[in-house]
Swiss-Prot record:
The gene is rpmF. It comes from Staphylococcus aureus (strain MW2). Keywords: Ribonucleoprotein, Ribosomal protein. One of its GO terms (biological process) is translation. This is Large ribosomal subunit protein bL32. GO terms for molecular function: structural constituent of ribosome.
Length: 57
């Protein structure tokens, strides 16, 4: 079995993980109330989706 000859340093480990990060979710402004919401989801503030009332407050 392959075993590393030397321990991986913190610097080398962190350099390898530079691209391993969480991306920011796509936020859009609600056309009804102007509150920020996730794309393709019902607005939590006013309950509208695609210009019509979907969820009651």
């Amino acid at each position: 079995m392959a075993v590393p000859k030397r321990r991986t340093s913190k610097t080398r480990k962190n350099k390898r993980r530079t691209h391993f990060k969480i991306s920011v979710p796509g936020m859009t402004e609600c056309p009804n109330c102007g509150e920020y919401k996730l794309s393709h989801r019902v607005c939590k503030n006013c309950g509208s989706y695609n210009g019509e009332e979907v969820a009651a407050k």
